[in-house]
Amino acid sequence: MTPTGTLYTVSAPSGAGKTSLVSALIDTTSNIMVSVSHTTRAKRPGEQEGVNYHFVSHEQFATMVENNAFLEHAQVFTNFYGTSKQWVEDTLAKGIDVILEIDWQGAQQVRKLIPAAKSVFILPPSRECLRERLTGRGQDDESVIDARMAEAKSEISHYVEAQYLIVNDDFDTALTEFRSIVVANRLALEKQQDKHQSLLESLLS
């Protein structure tokens, strides 16, 4: 019998390295996928439909909300983002783990709907390092970086709501810790019982 997959919410302040860690974990670990969110924002250069996001209109998004199609959804400035409930449920049923890259508010919504979900929070090693990373992107001016630093403090204040905490100082160490969380959950009794049901029955017969 194939055990159901585990749902992970991964949250972090902007610049903590969440997306890079999730990408590296997906590339080096079998049977785990990252959920592709629906969004109303415009597609940026280099982004692909169904890879980075599912791009929809405000009207389409509103209809999906009315139809209860989202596991969680949120408004960020003038745009909306949401996680497809059906896709997550179907993927977990196949025994594949799913990662949701969402903020603390989204993680709260998910935990209410799926209490078995595991929450991971990623921290930068210091405020100075976080600012250096944001500055190093070369995407924003100082006023935007100041705003992101203020947002980071608010996001970090919710770390206590997570079950697992990773400090992304050394990337390889953080990745190993992240992978260890996934492996440990796969070795949990209820998962192993489902996976090795026939073996256990034969050993006890």
Curated annotation (Swiss-Prot):
Its EC number is 2.7.4.8. InterPro entries: GK/Ca_channel_bsu, Guanylate_kin-like_dom, Guanylate_kinase, Guanylate_kinase_CS, P-loop_NTPase. One of its GO terms (molecular function) is ATP binding. It is found in: Cytoplasm. Residues 5-183 form the Guanylate kinase-like domain. Keywords: ATP-binding, Cytoplasm, Kinase, Nucleotide-binding, Transferase. It holds the Pfam family Guanylate_kin. It is an enzyme of class 2 (transferase). ATP binds at A12, P13, S14, G15, A16, G17, K18, T19. PROSITE patterns: GUANYLATE_KINASE_1, GUANYLATE_KINASE_2. Belongs to the guanylate kinase family. This is Guanylate kinase. It comes from Saccharophagus degradans (strain 2-40 / ATCC 43961 / DSM 17024).
